[in-house]
Amino acid sequence: VVLEPSAGTGLMAILAQIAGGSLILNELAETRADLLSSLFPANPVTRFDAAQIDDHLASGAVPSVVLMNPPFSVMANVTGRMADAAYRHVASALNRLAPGGRLVAITGANFGPDVPAWRDAFTRLQERGRVTFTAAVDGAVYAPHGTSIDTRLTVIDKLPVED
């Protein structure tokens, strides 16, 4: 079972579906949620704020994989930038993830365990899982999709952390 908490237009969800995953789709924005409902008619689309996805999904919705590209600095119902928006989304999705599951996140390039401003946040995340991979990704990779923002790919396995 694959959860995409901020599913957007389904670019990652379709890959999970092609790979055989059953989908849990969530998208707060009405237009994108309607598009997802059209593209994935067999899957209900919820419209929760993904920063609190763990609090809102049905108790039986427990994914073994989370694929996410959360907002980098935008929060629902908040005016202005929120520096910890990506962290809130990742933390809530990690809470929802099944033990032994894997979370894969595309975030802003500066959201990483080696960045001093995020070290404490990643220490807290590692109480629930271990970061098994993280790497910056040059924004040019995304040019075909209309953006060139530098990002980071981070993989967190929900396994006990080794001391």
Question: Predicted regions: what is each one?
Answer:
Residues 80-155:
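Conserved Class I SAM-dependent methyltransferase catalytic core
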Residues 1-77, 86-88, 95, 100, ...:
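Conserved S-adenosyl-L-methionine
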Residues 33-38, 79, 135-140, 163:
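Short, surface-exposed, charge-dense and proline/glycine-enriched linear segments
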